[in-house]
Amino acid sequence: MRKRISAIIMTLFMVFMSCNNGGPELKSDEVAKSDGTVLDLAKISKKIKDAVEFAASVKEIETLVKSIDELAKTIGQKLTKDTGVLAADANNNNGGLIAGVYGIVTDVGTKLDGLLKVNGISEDIKTKINDSKSKGTAFLSKVKGDDDLCKKDATDAHAKNAIDKNDNTGGKGKTELIALNTAIDELLKAANEAVEAAIKELTAPVKAEKPSQNN
């Protein structure tokens, strides 16, 4: 994200260097391109800033969702005292792990609700947020309605059926979790595209002048 912000600052600098103040009188936050196009830098800069902040919020949500993959790797394992090494645990105590994942997806839903309140987001992005919310809700409904998962001694097999995307059986949340991942990926892609679109307002090429028709 820091690299992106640095690139934006450099872009703004290049715009200042490439624009001139000729032609009509300009306001303090305006510059004119050589073709006469007037850019409102304050407005465009805010648009870029808002888009970058929104994309960062989506990235935070994506990181939460992807963290479930790491948690799935700890199914059937326990921490070894002193060494901190993960070792096999044959006691099938995965209820706490399932509860943790449930909490993460619940938090994801709350954060998605917050994104819907952001001013100025496109209808396409709103649709993708709502799609992500529905996918998260479907996962939560699947998990909380399963007797095999809602207990302390949830088995390794059942836990994998729920939160391991590589599990061959599934049936307890895996399909819904994959759908949530896909929806969040699409939302992040759209958010990044919004940043690129905002930047392009600064970097759009100058319109070529049409050749004169007079002889």
Curated annotation (Swiss-Prot):
One of its GO terms (cellular component) is cell outer membrane. Pfam families: Lipoprotein_6. The keyword Transmembrane helix does not apply. It is found in: Cell outer membrane. A lipid is attached at C19 (S-diacylglycerol cysteine). Keywords: Cell outer membrane, Lipoprotein, Membrane, Palmitate, Plasmid, Signal. A lipid is attached at C19 (N-palmitoyl cysteine). Its main location: membrane. Residues 1-18 form the signal peptide. The Vlp and Vsp proteins are antigenically distinct proteins, only one vlp or vsp gene is transcriptionally active at any one time. Switching between these genes is a mechanism of host immune response evasion. Genes for both Vlp and Vsp families are on (usually) unnamed linear plasmids in B.hermsii HS1. Belongs to the variable small protein (Vsp) family. This is Variable small protein 2. It comes from Borrelia hermsii. The gene is vsp2.
